[in-house]
Amino acid sequence: MSEPIYVLGGSQTDFARNWAREDLSIYDMFCEVLNQALTSTGISPDQIEVGHVGNFVGDLFTGQGLIGGFFAEAHPELSAIPTSRHEAACASGSIAILSAMRDIEAGHYDLACVLGLEYMRNVDGQTGAEYLGAATWKGVEATDCDFPWPFMFDQIINEYDVRYGINCDHLKAISKINFDNGRRNPNAQTRQWSFPPECYTDSDQFNPVIEGKVRKMDCGQITDGAACVFLASEKAAKAYAAEHQLKLSDIPVIKGWGHRSAPLSLDSKLKLSAGQPFLFPHVNQLMTDALCRAGFSHVTELDGLETHDCFSITEYMAIDHIGLTAPGESWKAIEEGRIGMDGDFPINPSGGLLGLGHPVGATGVRM
């Protein structure tokens, strides 16, 4: 990257909160996380030059669109800055981050605010599942099921089984690691939840089937929450460091990134990867891109990973696609204890989407 992008800091809401029960709106959520971020960093509103919002389904859950307009409602100093909202399903927050990076790299702005949020616990589970199904190809896939995404990820489990073989005990192990990690996170949705050992078995009482091979403990949470970060050019980061008596080297830098896409339908994705080593080649390619841009040759040069485990099979897929194991051999990293907190490559120390929670538009910003 020609222009280094610095991360000045930010904030995250408590993902255990139910904002509807508190009689608080999506605007209240927006304001709270923004103000927390301003306070924690010491940045003043008049220093922000551009605002980016990550949000997937605010229109459906709350009826609210044009969420970027909340910046000016929250602080009059922000009434003239350019703002935009980004929707890319579960990658909405990450795309908001990348868009802010592009603004800074192009030299248009020096200090960007990126805010991701989702307000989802105001409806029943069935309605929420239908809203989240907007990211499937409507009318083409997941048409005959109660829960679209558990249904879709069950198909991924089945495809893994056909191509490589899979033992669902390894998926249960992933779930347990993430829920255990979440107990250590003061912002995790599940930190105070109790999970008896039977939850990680095929017990229909403690771990009922949702769709196919996908059971309750395999599923990410329906979560309310928001996250906010400030990204800066080197010029703005130097000024911030001087103002706050910091060394520039004390401020984190985004070293690399990857961004790839694939056809909308799962069937199209799987047809494209037929005969190839990886189930989703574009996922392997984006990790290769990110490592290359960051100056790394292999994922094991990193100390660990935060990955998108909306379902346990998603993390299972990530393990081999990032190169930690050969394709289809994610189970080896699990059995060898590599991905737990005591392993040589911890995955999702935060608890991930399973343990920490998954307010969809906030997840990429939080990560």
Predicted regions and their residues:
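Conserved active-site "lid/cap" helical segment
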Residues: 1-91, 99, 156-168, 189-190, ...
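Condensing-enzyme catalytic core mediating Claisen C-C bond formation in acyl metabolism
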Residues: 1-27, 139, 162, 173-177, ...
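Short acidic, glycine/serine/threonine-rich loops at helix termini
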Residues: 19-21, 64-65, 123-129, 183-187, ...
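Beta-strand segments within the central parallel beta-sheet cores of soluble alpha/beta enzyme folds
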Residues: 45-55, 82-88, 112-117, 169-177, ...
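Acidic-enriched catalytic cores of C-N bond-cleaving enzymes acting on peptides and small amides
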Residues: 168-175, 184, 197-207, 241-245
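C-terminal catalytic subdomain
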Residues: 267-333, 344-348, 362
